[in-house]
From Swiss-Prot:
This is Type III pantothenate kinase. A monovalent cation. Ammonium or potassium. The keyword Cytoplasm applies. ATP binds at D11, A12, G13, N14, T15, S16, I17, K18, T122. Substrate binds at Y90, G97, I98, D99, R100, T175. One of its GO terms (biological process) is coenzyme A biosynthetic process. The keyword NADP does not apply. GO terms for cellular component: cytoplasm. Belongs to the type III pantothenate kinase family. It is found in: Cytoplasm.
Length: 244
């Protein structure tokens, strides 16, 4: 099978599942959902599967997708010591989250230089890669929603309704603003600290909260919503070539 084929990337994150269809190098569509989007005219020749979920949850999703596309070839992606000219910094490479690994690979190939990779989703994950493709390591911190939920779950009287979350100028003057803007400032301070450590590196950002941070960070960023899927395509194609 040529790698220039119809590919479905299944990216099972902590809170959502993202399905990305490729025709060659072109992204045809991207869908999010809890189950496989079988109601499409797209028939993948190969499926690249990447999951950060538990073994049990991953197995259920695997069965769901395989039932929808029984004739498709299947490659489960895992973090490796090296892939696509990128070297994993982890002593135990397989313990680096597959979403982080695929983001690192994609960012290196997109930027071809020193780059900081930020995935702002359920967690805020930051990885640093140099121009030679060496992954230098990274960080994992709570995402914006996780910080808010943690604060609310551990306090009795910090409460607000979603309609109370409005933008304002100056210091927050309501509980809703105090919590939401406080969590934003925590995330921004974390990212600004990393920028201080790597001021000459380019920045690539992805994830559901990417735009919210992008607008307030004051750092030149490039946003790639499909970064993990692009990395999956690169790594999957390399493995597919190796299997033939």
């Amino acid at each position: 099978m040529s790698v220039e084929s119809r590919v479905l990337v299944v990216d099972a994150g902590n809170t959502s599942i993202k399905f990305t269809a490729f025709e060659g190098e072109q992204v045809l569509w991207v869908l999010r959902g809890d189950s496989c989007p079988a109601e499409t005219d797209f028939a993948p020749q190969v499926i690249y599967f990447a999951s950060v979920r538990s073994k049990e949850q991953s197995a259920l999703l695997h069965a769901d997708v395989q039932a929808a596309f029984p004739s498709s070839e299947w490659i489960t992606l895992t973090s490796q010591a090296t892939a696509c000219c990128v070297r994993n910094a982890y002593i135990e490479p397989e313990r680096l989250g597959i979403d982080r690994w695929l983001g690192v690979v994609a960012a290196h190939h997109l930027i071809k230089g020193n780059v900081v990779v930020v995935d702002a989703g359920t967690a805020i994950k930051v990885d640093v890669v140099n121009s030679e493709g060496a992954h230098l390591g990274g960080y994992i911190a709570p995402g914006l929603a996780m910080m808010t939920e943690s604060l609310l779950s551990k306090t009795a009287r910090i409460r607000f309704d979603s309609h109370e979350v409005v933008e304002g100028e100056g210091l927050p003057n309501s509980t809703a603003r105090a919590v939401t803007e406080g969590c934003h400032e925590m995330a921004l301070g974390f990212l600004e600290r990393i920028h201080h450590l790597y001021p000459e590196f380019k920045w690539v950002v992805t994830g559901g909260d990417a735009q919210a941070l992008l607008n307030r960070l004051g750092i030149a960023l490039e946003c790639f919503p499909n970064l993990v899927a692009l990395g999956a395509k690169l790594v999957g194609d390399e493995q597919l070539r190796g299997n033939k």
